[in-house]
Amino acid sequence: MKEMSANTVLDSQRQQKHYGITSPISLASPKEIDHIYTQKLIDAMKPFGVFEDEEELNHRLVVLGKLNNLVKEWISDVSESKNLPPSVVATVGGKIFTFGSYRLGVHTKGADIDALCVAPRHVERSDFFQSFFEKLKHQDGIRNLRAVEDAFVPVIKFEFDGIEIDLVFARLAIQTISDNLDLRDDSRLRSLDIRCIRSLNGCRVTDEILHLVPNKETFRLTLRAVKLWAKRRGIYSNMLGFLGGVSWAMLVARTCQLYPNAAASTLVHKFFLVFSKWEWPNPVLLKQPEESNLNLPVWDPRVNPSDRYHLMPIITPAYPQQNSTYNVSTSTRTVMVEEFKQGLAVTDEILQGKSDWSKLLEPPNFFQKYRHYIVLTASASTEENHLEWVGLVESKIRVLVGNLERNEFITLAHVNPQSFPGNKEHHKDNNYVSMWFLGIIFRRVENAESVNIDLTYDIQSFTDTVYRQANNINMLKEGMKIEATHVKKKQLHHYLPAEILQKKKKQSLSDVNRSSGGLQSKRLSLDSSCLDSSRDTDNGTPFNSPASKSDSPSVGETERNSAEPAAVIVEKPLSVPPAQGLSIPVIGAKVDSTVKTVSPPTVCTIPTVVGRNVIPRITTPHNPAQGQPHLNGMSNITKTVTPKRSHSPSIDGTPKRLKDVEKFIRLESTFKDPRTAEERKRKSVDAIGGESMPIPTIDTSRKKRLPSKELPDSSSPVPANNIRVIKNSIRLTLNR
């Protein structure tokens, strides 16, 4: 019996080695204390509504069953209308697949369902958005039905018996769709258009993730905890440059592969251990990328120069492999890595019995964290316009973050994913206002008593991008405005209610009081390390910008309240020369010369001449010698400035096979920049399996990032029609 038991254990261990691209770090089974900590983790998560009860789960199944029947009926009707033989119509089939958090089994109460409608080859996409849309319109229980055909992944959105559903469409090059269809088969992608491939990709990635984890239930519980933590800490948003649900799932799946037998409480701790020490931009891979003869574009930095600029690559496991985190910027990566380290310190305390899981789920003190903030405001005159406008502005905020990162004097631009309702007293002409806050860290300049910083171009190129996109999709309407204002921490009470600021401050002090040696971070004090006083000027400058219609009336000029902190509105012509190396044009035409002034507070000084007394912006790559910026400190900037690289480095050799090798604990993969491969090799003597095959990547901490494929703004035509839009000029002086 003992021999059989030993053989069983050995067989189990051999099987576990097939998960992931390296051997596991530990095969240790959980102890009793691990199960106790796991139960405590579950108890800590329950108040946040992350678990659905049986009744709610069954209701979702009923709704999906109804939707599946509707799809089959519709496909049958379409088949008849296209004169297919009755024998074919009877067996044509059709099916609904789910993906995303629901398919992974980690959806929360009230969450929507991502679903895919799969149809046979004779059903067109136009049928889906026309006849099926009409069928849904007349179906009982359907509410808020809307189609988004021009989206990156075209979708129909609706509520069905109280459940929100996002339904995408794909037709396969086969005559019938059986109930046991396996979408993981790569051959299903043959002869499909790109929109169908994108639609199928969600299901294929989700299913592949579930096939690549050793224990699905442990994976699900761990992922629930990590997703809740990420949302609570303000780093859950693919749109804003953090990570979305699929990316978090892949990071947790990789952790499960490395510790295949661990309990969820242990895996949460190991998650922070692994990714607080991960050497980005080495990619996270769940399996070796597979080649295919379908010749679809895949993520490969050896072949695609743009892939070398990705800062935090997490590669989807299903063909065609893609980087799910191409929106990540230098700032968002810095914030996330800091959060990984903080999470590791907290879970260390929890597993030592010094703290409990509720501490891990405490929100951050964002409004006490920084000395300087930029308030971004989006407003519209009607609720319907506001919903559209806010969605577009939010989707482009990462453009603003990128612009600010390229500013010579900015170390970090941290956007808070949560938006807030705006103060209507500041926007009397628009009743619908939303605000976002960006925490800013400015660089310390050596041997300078004061620094004059001009953020005008960074803001204007961002607003031009948004207005151009709105015009291109015929969204831009009278009353839609964007404004940006620089404020200091002590002035935030002009924008946010006291309970929000006080609550955050209280939590911050509580964190400090309860922190032990293991929780002391490397952050410097804001009050001691930043340049102290600042003087800034916000100039609202109206000028012509694109409109969707030639007869559109002019938008009224926004007048700021004189009580607004450190904000000075000077509505006058402003000529801002474009910064070197940026391709986004500033749209402008005839400028209204009307001038309105408001006396500034005594602490403010307005530069008398635009461009004078302002240190010119020179974009530079990040200097590794300066180290990572502390999230609430100031880093030094040297006098010697190196221009940004304007082209991708050449590749002398191209390895033939992707290979990822991780070290024990350090977990370094071999997707290395060739220039540092030897250095890293000397650091490592305990590599796990496989030989090193360097693939060039580029750490673009302070280098020029290539534009996202979603943002073809610089190449968009400049419209001839104009609508006058308020623009902000932001200049400030930082003193020691």
Curated annotation (Swiss-Prot):
Entry similarity comment: Belongs to the poly(A) polymerase family.
GO cellular component: cytosol; membrane; nuclear body; nucleoplasm; nucleus
Binding site residues for Mg(2+) 1: 112, 114
Modified positions (Phosphothreonine) in chain numbering: 654
Protein name, per record: Poly(A) polymerase gamma
Skewed-composition ranges (Low complexity): 521-532
Site (Interaction with RNA): 152, 157, 327, 398, 532
Residues reported to bind Mg(2+) 2: 112, 114, 166
Compositional bias ranges of the Basic and acidic residues kind: 673-685
UniProt cross-references to InterPro entries, sorted A to Z: NT_sf, NuclTrfase_I-like_C, PolA_pol_cen_dom, PolA_pol_NTPase, PolA_pol_RNA-bd_dom
Domain of life of the source: Eukaryota
Keywords, in A-Z order: Acetylation, ATP-binding, Magnesium, Manganese, Metal-binding, mRNA processing, Nucleotide-binding, Nucleus, Phosphoprotein, RNA-binding, Transferase
Pfam family, one: PAP_NTPase
Entry EC no(s): 2.7.7.19
Modified residues (Phosphoserine): 23, 29, 525, 599, 648, 684, 708
Molecular function terms from GO: ATP binding; metal ion binding; poly(A) RNA polymerase activity; RNA binding
Modified-residue entries (N6-acetyllysine), positions: 2
Required cofactor names: Mg(2+); Mn(2+)
Positions with biased composition (Polar residues): 509-519, 539-555
Location within or outside the cell: Nucleus
Transmembrane segments: none
